[in-house]
Swiss-Prot record:
<dbReference type="GO" id="GO:0004033">
    <property type="term" value="F:aldo-keto reductase (NADPH) activity"/>
</dbReference>
<dbReference type="GO" id="GO:0009507">
    <property type="term" value="C:chloroplast"/>
</dbReference>
<feature type="active site" description="Proton donor">
    <location>
        <position position="52"/>
    </location>
</feature>
<comment type="function">
    <text>Oxidoreductase acting on a broad range of substrates: reduces ketosteroids, aromatic aldehydes, ketones, sugars and other aliphatic aldehydes, and oxidizes hydroxysteroids. Aldehyde reductase that catalyzes the reduction of the aldehyde carbonyl groups on saturated and alpha,beta-unsaturated aldehydes. No activity on alpha,beta-unsaturated ketones. Can use propionaldehyde, butyraldehyde, methylglyoxal, (E)-2-pentenal, (E)-2-hexenal, (Z)-3-hexenal and (E)-2-nonenal as substrates, propenal (acrolein), crotonaldehyde, but not 2-butanone, 3-buten-2-one or 1-penten-3-one.</text>
</comment>
<dbReference type="InterPro" id="IPR023210">
    <property type="entry name" value="NADP_OxRdtase_dom"/>
</dbReference>
<keyword id="KW-0521">NADP</keyword>
<feature type="binding site">
    <location>
        <begin position="262"/>
        <end position="266"/>
    </location>
    <ligand>
        <name>NADP(+)</name>
    </ligand>
</feature>
<keyword id="KW-0216">Detoxification</keyword>
<keyword id="KW-0150">Chloroplast</keyword>
<dbReference type="GO" id="GO:0009414">
    <property type="term" value="P:response to water deprivation"/>
</dbReference>
<dbReference type="InterPro" id="IPR036812">
    <property type="entry name" value="NADP_OxRdtase_dom_sf"/>
</dbReference>
<dbReference type="GO" id="GO:0016229">
    <property type="term" value="F:steroid dehydrogenase activity"/>
</dbReference>
<keyword id="KW-0934">Plastid</keyword>
<feature type="modified residue" description="N-acetylalanine">
    <location>
        <position position="2"/>
    </location>
</feature>
<dbReference type="GO" id="GO:0009636">
    <property type="term" value="P:response to toxic substance"/>
</dbReference>
<dbReference type="GO" id="GO:0008106">
    <property type="term" value="F:alcohol dehydrogenase (NADP+) activity"/>
</dbReference>
<dbReference type="InterPro" id="IPR018170">
    <property type="entry name" value="Aldo/ket_reductase_CS"/>
</dbReference>
Length: 315
């Protein structure tokens, strides 16, 4: 099964696995087993972030997988992300060093700016009074230095609108390799998809199933009638069809699960496809962004006065 996985090519030349394991909201105590199961099933990309609070546990499992020769380090693609409290240029290398220590790695394959937002250093949680003016150019220069050092084999961004990505591409010496954003049949990101393709930036989808396990998001992505009709006709689960849709759209997907059965099911998306006439039906699905980033918006204290401003109208 491991051989069945397909890859995308990044603008660095690196091979980027088309399906990865998301670890957002994967509880400590469960995430390690999920990572071990996923790697044994054939996953070759683990998507992490410092703010998820589970990198130490993932690091311990990775170490064991390497020691037991289940997989070689060079055959795994590991992503992590710079949190909003570490955007000051002097804090960027320290943040990556902490992540590398926790993950017990010498390098990450991809390091992303998690959000285009800055929060006061040392803040716990996100309070409006701790939001600071954003300076992406300075932060990006520090990211480029990490790329130069080899500690981050590729660098990129997450939650960037088309405009924010375009602004960054104007000034970047090392262009971002990836923009990781919410993307699923109920939030297709058509404009951003087209822009990324035109600029050689790979779009990677978090919440490709609409985060069904998340309590604070109202998500009906997997209940969509069109998705379910296609799933029934193809003899697949709605989750498999949502993931396969993403691959056929030309982007990678990062489904999160700590259930071994679902981890396996989510990986079984390579040896079949959605026929064109069914694929066309997805254009009829009503669109709604789930992760609005409202926690970064405040009418007086934030650089983003509205959700429209945070996403530059892409809502």
């Amino acid at each position: 099964m491991a051989n069945a996985i397909t890859f995308f090519k990044l603008n660095t030349g690196a091979k980027f696995p088309s399906v990865g394991l998301g670890t957002w909201q994967a509880s400590p105590g469960l995430v390690g087993d999920a990572v071990a199961a996923a790697v044994k099933i054939g996953y070759r990309h683990i998507d992490c972030a410092q703010i998820y609070g589970n990198e130490k546990e993932i690091g311990a499992v990775l170490k064991k997988l390497f020691e037991d020769r289940v997989v070689k380090r060079e055959d795994l693609f590991i992503t992590s992300k710079l949190w909003c409290t570490d955007h000051d240029p002097q804090d960027v290398p320290e943040a990556l060093n902490r992540t590398l220590k926790d993950l017990q790695l010498e390098y990450v394959d991809l390091y992303l700016i998690h959000w285009p937002a800055r929060i006061k250093k040392g803040s716990v949680g996100i309070k409006p009074e701790n939001l600071l003016p954003v300076d992406i150019p300075s932060t990006w220069k520090a990211m480029e230095a990490l790329y130069d050092s080899g500690k981050a084999r590729a660098i990129g961004v997450s939650n960037f609108s088309t405009k924010k990505l375009a602004d960054l591409l104007e000034l970047a010496r090392v262009p971002p390799a990836v923009n990781q954003v919410e993307c699923h049949p109920s939030w297709r990101q058509t404009k951003l998809q087209e822009f990324c393709k035109s600029k050689g930036v790979h779009l990677s989808a978090y919440s490709p199933l609409g985060s069904p396990g998340t309590t604070w998001l109202k998500s009906d992505v997997l209940k969509n009638p069109i998705l379910n009709m296609v799933a029934e006709k193809l003899g697949k689960s709605p989750a498999q069809v949502a993931l396969r849709w993403g691959l056929q759209m030309g982007h990678s997907v990062l489904p999160k699960s700590t259930n071994e059965g679902r981890i396996k099911e989510n990986f079984n998306v390579f040896d079949w496809s959605i026929p064109d006439y069914m694929f066309a039906k997805f254009a009829e699905i009503e669109q709604a962004r789930l992760v609005t980033g409202s926690f970064l918006v405040h009418e007086t204290l934030s650089p983003y006065k509205s959700i429209e401003e945070l996403w530059d109208g892409e809502i």
